[in-house]
Amino acid sequence: PGRMGRPTPGKRVMSGDRLERLTAEADIRQLVARYAVCLDKRDLDGLVALFVPDVQVGRDTTGRRALHDSFATQLATVGVTILNTGTHQIDLGGPGAEDLATGHVYCKAEIQDGDRWIHQAIRYDDTYRRVEGRWLFVRRIHRLFYGAEVGENPLALAPANWPAGHTGMGTLPFEDPTWQDFNSGKDSTAPTDDTGRPL
C-alpha cells in the first residue's frame, strides 16, 4: 500500500507553474516565427496582428493601423527578404508580472536591395505581453551586428526549376498571394511578370 503514491522511477511530475512557463515560452517562440514568415510573405495584416492593439509607433502615434503604414513604407524600399531566426533567450515576468516577458532573438537576414544582395546579422530586443491568453509584441527593437553585400545576387540567377535543378532562383516569395497583393501596382527594380516575380 505504501508504494501506491510513489512516482514511477524516471518519471517526473510537472507542476502547474512549470507547465505554464514552458507553454508561455513555446507561445513566444511561435510569435517570433510568425513575425518572420509574415514579414517575408508581406502579410502585413498578419504581421501587425502579432502586436498589442495599442502598440507605440514612433513618438506620437499608436495602434496597428499606424504600424501597418510604417511597415508598408519600410518594406517598399527593399525587395525579397528572408529572416532566419535562431538563438532566443526569454525572460518571463515574476510574481505580479506573469503576463509580461522580455527576450533577445538572434537573426540572420538576407535582403534584396535593388541589384545588391545583403546579409545582416541582427539581434531583436523584444518586450512581450499576454493579452487575453495570447502573447504579443509590445516592442521590437532591431539592432545590427553587421550588414554585408554578397558577391552574387541570387535573384539574378536563372530559374532553378525545382526539383529538377538544385541551384538557381526559386518561386518564393513570388507565388505567395500576400506578396503579390503587396507588390501590385508598385514600381520594381526589375521587370516583373503578373505574379511580381522578376523576369
Where are these regions (language model features)?
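A solvent-exposed, acidic/Ser-Thr-rich amphipathic alpha-helical stretch
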Residues: L44-D113
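Short beta-strand segments enriched in hydrophobic/aromatic residues
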Residues: L39, F51, C107-A109, I141-L144
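Short, cysteine-centered beta-strand-loop-beta hairpins and adjacent loop/turn segments enriched
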Residues: E110-H119, G147
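Acidic/histidine-enriched, glycine/proline-rich intrinsically disordered or flexible terminal extensions
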Residues: V150-L199
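Short, surface-exposed coil-to-beta transition loops
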Residues: L83-T85, I118-D125
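N-terminal amphipathic/basic-hydrophobic helices that include classical n-h-c signal peptides
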Residues: P1-V13, P191-L199
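Short beta-strand edge/turn micro-motifs at domain boundaries
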Residues: R12, L100-T102, R123-L157, W162-T167
